[in-house]
């Protein structure tokens, strides 16, 4: 597809890379010429220097012929104006990044009077991700599919875990409609068969219905979060506190800027707001950080978040949630079993890629959702089986899938099925697939050739 991206910041750059990898025709609009030249050369994209809300620039970029127009600058108003112009000029779909809470009210979201195809708020998406993590604190990560019907969680198999030494067949007998999709063993990813055995140190990715996963989560380690400490009063904290408003979790927030601390204290009177440096060891000890069930370190400085997270882990914090913007730093912290990393850039890019791939329809089936897990090494895909699909009506055992492919779930008439080889695919089904294969755009890409 022909896709125009406006803005070459962190999200825009990552989007260009992902779109080029999937063989889309990408045009980049960026005000800074040196940035544009560097990225145009690196990713082999066509570039236009200028303001994405400028009619002449959009005309030069031939926005009238684009399939998807994506505005990702750091200015909400520029994104919205450029997308409105692009739509009027003939762009088929428009996606905008909007971060300001003022533009996240119910009227703007639900009525969508500006006609955007998708509104992406990285901080709000990250807050929702953290809220899921707070709900399931024993999991290293939590992803949702099929409008929340299916959940994918990552767990560490610890020394005293009852999962150690258990085969996949034994696991399925014990837990019913829950599947181990992938095992990460010392960096090697495995799609397990029935005879595969879990070992101490494995990171396992498990999927199932929300209610079944809640029971499994309790089985792993019956621990809930009653006290939460937030470090940093940014947009993520703002959205997270709104999400948790009706929750019974006791929340304390530490913020070093006076105006922000006062604002949060007024907006969220139920939250204990402390003025100070939440990354300072002495203050954390003074505020009894070790007594909290979970701490989310959400400042704007990656290094401070990582170092603070490491200190908190030394205090024995059960659940460490750490914001890291630069993916190059993930390896430093990703091996620690009590830590959940959130990367707003990656969450935003994944959201946009869900949409783009959903619009990139094949004749027989459509790929309408995509999630990256394990730092992008695992893809979870959602396909819809359409009328002329050749695999409709066949048993899963009759289909020869390529190595590294697992059918995790079938969504049929709003209900989730966690299949065996005897289940058949029907027209209208949505299937959730976990795979080690990259850049899959069609369900037939998953079959042996």
Task: Walk through the language-model features, giving the residues of each.
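Cytosolic regulatory regions of ion transport systems
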Residues: 1-449
